[in-house]
Amino acid sequence: WPPPKVSP
C-alpha cells in the first residue's frame, strides 16, 4: 500500500 500522506 502507498505510504500515508504527511503534511509538513
Curated annotation (Swiss-Prot):
Q: Which GO terms describe its cellular component?
A: extracellular region
Q: Which GO terms describe its biological process?
A: blood vessel diameter maintenance; regulation of blood pressure
Q: What is this protein called?
A: Bradykinin-potentiating peptide Brachy
Modified residue Proline amide is at which positions? P8
Q: Where in the cell is it found?
A: Secreted
Record's comment on post-translational modification: Both amidated and non-amidated peptides have been observed in skin secretions.
* Entry function: The amidated peptide increases the release of nitric oxid (NO) and that NO mediates the endothelium-dependent vasodilatation. In addition, it inhibits efficiently angiotensin I-converting enzyme (ACE) in rat serum (IC(50)=8.2 uM). 3D-structure modeling of this peptide in complex with ACE suggests it acts by inhibiting the ACE C-terminal catalytic site.
**This protein's superkingdom?**
Eukaryota
Presence of the UniProt keyword Magnesium in the record = no
